[in-house]
Curated annotation (Swiss-Prot):
Belongs to the XK family. It is found in: Membrane. The chain crosses the membrane at residues 35-55, 68-88, 98-118, 174-194, 204-224, 241-261, 269-289, 306-326, 357-377, 382-402. This is XK-related protein 2. Pfam families: XK-related. The lineage of its organism: Eukaryota, Metazoa, Chordata, Craniata, Vertebrata. GO terms for cellular component: plasma membrane. The keyword Thylakoid does not apply. It comes from Mus musculus (Mouse). It is a multi-pass membrane protein. Keywords: Membrane, Transmembrane, Transmembrane helix.
């Protein structure tokens, strides 16, 4: 994931005096090329083009059923992507007819990408010049094991470019879990029952798989940023690689199991899958109603109660879509302004993976014993074992990340080993000592990443 700015190591920053706490003055932020925006736009255009191509092929072959579902998944995710970009950029309150028209014809990500490129070129030409409009941003940072508070100036142009990046991160998650996941699952199902994989369908499945993996990786990064909003977080290549491997194994094994289960039971599998999704969808609302809390009214200052309700419903649908295929890396909390529980939530993570593992084992057993007509030329037992092993490996890689590679693992009250000791050895969890300086709060916690 590319960064908007970078903070150098401790010797390059200058401490300044403060009556309340020591603040280190950071250098002027350095902007980088927005690769993530280009990549997200490429995935959107590639998946859209391949989906429309398959719709044309299905229509030509009079396969109306397959054509309808392929087009429906494409349209739903595309509309949600346009609404996400409009919401983040607040276009409804601005006079921007060209942007709204491009969103209307489902080309909003393309025009937004061009705007971001123009903004980057403008910054590149003005590099070294001071901007007249700047704001101060403060973040905590761990340097050599010590927690320090860093302050730096952020120009208006860099903040605008950062807003584009944030919008595309959220767009990629919407596209991944509300469009690519159902599209990939359905195309796998069609390939399985038709016993053929034409080039167009293979390209569509490839774009969908890359989109899902990228969206899940971003989901982890955004979860870390939201939970530790006061901290400047760095994720190195090894951490990103670990997250990508974890998510790829988790999602592919889960989706293949769902496809084999659906191909085995046909329509009989629909009630199980729908019930599974509805439980995830209504679980945050049940907790919200049981808590007796009021609906948050400060999500967006210009929103009415109806607008707030629409946002909450949309977020809940996205949350359910993520948890249906993989772990969301955060727990939804509708009564909170940030809509997420910022605790570590080891229990929530353990419950999710335990339930999903049991579900996967049950679906694999159904495929093994009843899927005689699905894959006649393959050993069902070998396929079942490989899928379960792949899912277990993904859990192992996830535990490895939280134990050794999490950027702020030193702030954990308990880590993975503590919980394994508690569960396996039946011993009380040893409480790790928190950093004594974590109570130091920044005056300004506005985040631009």
């Amino acid at each position: 994931m590319d960064r908007v700015y970078e903070i150098p190591e401790e010797p390059n920053v200058v401490p300044i005096s403060s009556l309340e706490e020591d603040v280190i003055r950071g250098p002027n932020p350095r902007f980088t090329f927005p690769f993530s925006i280009l990549f997200s736009t490429f995935l959107y255009c590639g998946e859209a083009a391949s989906a429309l191509y398959m719709v044309r092929i299905y229509r030509k072959n009079n396969e109306t059923f397959w054509m309808t579902y392929t087009f429906s998944f494409f349209m739903f995710s595309s509309i949600m992507v346009q609404l996400t970009l409009i919401f983040v950029h607040r276009d409804l309150a601005k006079d921007r007819p060209l942007s709204l028209f491009m969103h209307l014809i489902l080309l909003g990500p393309v025009i937004r990408c061009l705007e971001a490129m123009i903004k980057y070129l403008t910054l590149w030409k003005k590099e070294g010049q001071e901007e007249p409009y700047v704001s101060l941003t403060r973040k905590k940072m761990l340097i050599a094991g010590q927690e320090v508070l860093i302050e730096w100036e952020v120009g208006h142009s860099i903040r605008t470019l950062a807003m584009h990046r944030n919008a595309y991160k959220r767009m990629s998650q919407i596209q991944a879990f509300l469009g690519s996941v159902p599209q990939l699952t359905y195309q796998l199902y069609v390939s399985l029952i038709s016993a053929e994989v034409p080039l167009g369908r293979a390209v569509l499945m490839a774009f969908s798989l890359i989109s899902v993996t990228y969206g899940a990786t971003l989901c982890n990064m955004l979860a870390i940023q939201i939970k530790y909003d006061d901290y400047k977080i760095r994720l190195g290549p090894l951490e990103v690689l670990c997250i990508t491997v974890w998510r790829t194994l988790e999602i592919t094994s889960r989706l293949v199991i769902l496809v084999l289960f659906s191909a085995t039971l046909k329509l009989k599998a629909v009630p199980f899958l729908v019930l599974n999704f509805l439980i995830i969808l209504f679980e945050p609302w049940v907790k919200f109603w049981r808590s007796g809390a009021q609906m948050p009214n400060n999500i967006e200052k210009n929103f009415s109660r109806v607008g707030t309700l629409v946002v909450l419903i949309s977020v809940t649908i996205l949350y359910a879509g993520i948890n249906f295929s993989c772990w969301s890396a955060m727990q939804l909390k509708l009564a909170d302004r940030d809509l997420v529980d910022k605790g570590q939530n080891w229990g929530h993570m353990g419950l999710h993976y335990s339930v999903r593992l049991v579900e996967n084992v049950i679906m694999v057993l159904v495929f093994k014993y009843f899927g005689v007509k699905v894959l006649l030329n393959y050993c069902h037992s070998l396929i079942a074992v490989q899928l379960i092993i792949a899912y277990l490996i993904s859990i192992g890689v996830m535990l490895l990340f939280f134990q050794y590679l999490h950027p702020l693992r030193s702030l954990f009250t308990n880590n993975v080993v503590d919980y394994l000791h508690c569960i396996c050895c039946r011993r009380p969890r040893p409480e790790r000592v928190e950093n004594s300086e974590t109570s130091c709060e920044a005056d300004t916690t506005q985040s631009i990443v």
